[in-house]
Amino acid sequence: MATKGVVKGIVSNLVTVEVDGPVSQNEICYIDVNGTKLMSEVIKVIGKNAYVQVFESTRGMHVGDEAEFVGSMLEVTLGPGMLSKNYDGLQHDLDKMDGVFLKRGDYTAALDDDKLWDFKPLAKVGDNVIAGSWLGEVTENFQPHRIMVPFVFEGGYKVKSVAQAGQYKVNDVIAVVTDADGKDHNVTMVQKWPVKRAIPCYREKPRPFKLLETGIRIIDTFNPIVEGGTGFIPGPFGTGKTVLQHAISKQAEADIVIIAACGERANEVVEIFAEFPHLNDPHTGRKLMERTIIIANTSNMPVASREASVYTAMTIAEYYRSMGLRVLMMADSTSRWAQALREMSNRLEELPGPDAFPMDLSAIVANFYARAGFVYLNNGATGSVTFIGTVSPAGGNLKEPVTESTKKVARCFYALEQNRADRKRYPAVNPIDSYSKYLEYPEFESYISNHIASDWITKVNDLKMRLHQGKEIAEQINILGDDGVPVNYHVTFWKAELIDFVILQQDAFDSVDCNSSLERQELMLSKVSDICRTEFDFEDFLEVSDYFKLVINIFKQVNYSEFKSADYDKYNKELDAILAERIK
């Protein structure tokens, strides 16, 4: 029999319920408020009192209102039909909801129960299967969507029957499997999984090593991220976080893109809803939305649903990874998620940590980031979840707790800087403060050596050192003036500017420059490295600046020309001729 309870206290979204039976941490309950059932989650249990966070506004709730516990955790519904959907943090389909504001207690189904899917069996009668094994597949927006043995099944099973190829609804039985005790279990296209638990259906989770190509030079060349890697983008307001995220999600070599807009301002979420359906996928020529899922929670939505949205997004990402697909998940912004954790922690009167965030903030962030990764599935296929979160530190302060906690666990750090944004040097990623720990991985080094160039990482480290030198000399020039430093200092400074203007800066709104292939980046890196290693002969600092401005200008024309086109070759020859004039 389901456990019931009575409301004893209300503090905004935190409600104390006195229960008449057993309840567990993270269990879902529904509180009846004037006939409307409000979804809630247990976050703490002390004696007979369960503290629950309500996913809706608690206006109109009274002491004495009844609550009913469902006996399960917050779960997502997993099955075909999720691609192209717009969900809220609890996986309710926003497109099915009417009105400007969402009605309280209005919950919609995540999947379309009536749609017919073309099913094709992959398993045969008599096959031995375990949780996560592929039984068949349907085509969802041109992607193969594998129908798997439910993740909750434990131990080994034998396939008793599989449906023939044909059209079926998501709730139709497509297979029957028999467990070790001889008991039969029906399998449909749909399964449920609790969002707070990672899906464990894989054989091995090695260190990721395969470069994830994004087409953004400051990422791919200077601070690469890998398939199954983690990264984060901190930056103050107006530094281009959202544009950079859009560019990554549009251009990255991923099969599925999941965007969790957890607590962003309403106008930014509207921008995502308005823009994404019109974006073209450069890989397939189709609409990007066909392989995208958007999970949106604005800042004015209740705190609890903001927290749930990132877990919902990650669980869906893990589900697609279990099909052997490459998934890219973007969260914008994890700061709002951390603020939601802070709010509930404060209401529970827990011991506060720095800036009143929970004491265990680092552990919560680390556990979440650990769910990303590259895996070998039980059938030998590979899948990955690459996670990139943005952080919006108050006042651009990169020493605040959320940034510090994320820095400990994310392997890539792309620091957006107000100073670079003010000078219109986009993407405004600071090349000196940013880093990628993957450059230190031996597996990644050997992958780069075998697939791109053996001296790639050496050249990148050399250019990074030159950027450091350029920054130091720029400070000296600012203090002493142009005449106060030797000419060779000016040459070093302008070589750093060349790296910045040619490789680091990129036009996200130009159809050619927005996306650089790895082959193109390799040629650019070699060319810029050669220029930086060349000794030039100049009389004074004016000659240096005039010459390098000319080189940068021609290089910009190369960047705006289609790769290996007539214009591209023409500007490259022009560049070679100008460089030959000045070599010592």
Where are these regions (language model features)?
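P-loop NTPase nucleotide-binding/switch module
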Residues: 99-133, 137-140, 145-152, 169-229, ...
